[in-house]
Amino acid sequence: MKKYDRGWASLETGAALLIVMLLIAWGAGIWQDYIQTKGWQTEARLVSNWTSAARSYIGKNYTTLQGSSTTTTPAVITTTMLKNTGFLSSGFTETNSEGQRLQAYVVRNAQNPELLQAMVVSSGGTPYPVKALIQMAKDITTGLGGYIQDGKTATGALRSWSVALSNYGAKSGNGHIAVLLSTDELSGAAEDTDRLYRFQVNGRPDLNKMHTAIDMGSNNLNNVGAVNAQTGNFSGNVNGVNGTFSGQVKGNSGNFDVNVTAGGDIRSNNGWLITRNSKGWLNETHGGGFYMSDGSWVRSVNNKGIYTGGQVKGGTVRADGRLYTGEYLQLERTAVAGASCSPNGLVGRDNTGAILSCQSGRWSGGNKINYSACNWYKSSVAMNHFIGGKSGGSIYYKPIQCPTGYIMTGTRMYGIGDGVDEEHVDAYCCPFN
């Protein structure tokens, strides 16, 4: 059977394929335009960031730039300057995707030379197409975005403004970007640096920074989280719970209601470590130290011993228990056997080093006195007259001493008759056991 409509089917198929190819070509163009637009938008954001950094730089250095510019001669700001001063991050590239380099030209306003105005201009590299310039001029968010089409004039987005590059001492070429920073914009930037913002401004930490001293007029700073400072001077009291200091704390006096903890030494150059209420010094690790609980004695905490390789010296030294020495007992003063002493029980030595003890009020040697065996001993008898007597005044001596091993504990005198020499002295001698 013959097919009379076969040609129509082929024609329909070809038409459908043609439409698909046209749609693909159209879609590819739309996609390409979309990609380009996104790229230009990205470039516009980069220009906006650069311009914002330049605006901040001008605001902070307003007075300096006034001195280095005129109405016709600009002060030029480069990417390197913005990076070195921290207004741009160190990773910001010197050129954009087309190799163009941004610079800001700052001049004085011709009508009011005390005010500054600026133009951000790109130069060098590959020119942008007009379509890209128009798109980017509209997308720039800092300042008034524009572009350069004739190499001499900067034109604003939607042709909203037009300024000759020569007014700013700038040079560029066709297909480049321009951004106008008006006197109002830069005056606002200068004022930004003079204000202390109550809230954080993203990307603008300088707005929360003081650049001079602040006088609170005797008013308070309340609800402060932390105070970080190099030094502090207080004419009144400083009250707090805890304090940590990495350096020195100096003052005329200090009062603490609770504790003071130091990681190193506590020194007094010309004063005392004064405590009250039966307190003193305590070593927490070992539980020892010194304190006073009355007006007479310095006491050892927990009855700890006192150890030194040097001397312990005092008017008197008393031991309620035994007195020990790891070497010898050295007695520096000497006593004389038989001499009086007090109280009984003292221990001494004579000049030869022999030990003496105080017994019954007399220094005696190591042997005890046998008082039950004491006897009177008298001097020898000499029948002679005293001085002025019958024998013509001769003088005679009658010595008396105790036998060896005895000690004299008393004396008595004996005499008879006028002029008769029967006077003598008796000695009361007691033997040692």
UniProtKB/Swiss-Prot annotation:
- Any miscellaneous information on file? This protein is expressed by a shufflon (= clustered inversion region that works as a biological switch). The orfs of this region share a constant N-terminus, while the C-terminus is variable.
Q: What is this protein called?
A: Shufflon protein C'
Does the keyword section mention NAD? no
Keywords, in A-Z order: Plasmid
Q: Which InterPro entries match?
A: Enolase-like_N (IPR029017), Shufflon_N (IPR007001)
Task: State the residue spans of region: Constant region.
Answer: 1-361
Q: What does UniProt list as this organism's lineage? A: Bacteria, Pseudomonadati, Pseudomonadota, Gammaproteobacteria, Enterobacterales
Annotated region Variable region: where?
Answer: 362-433
What domain of life is recorded for the organism? Bacteria
- Where does the signal peptide begin and end? none
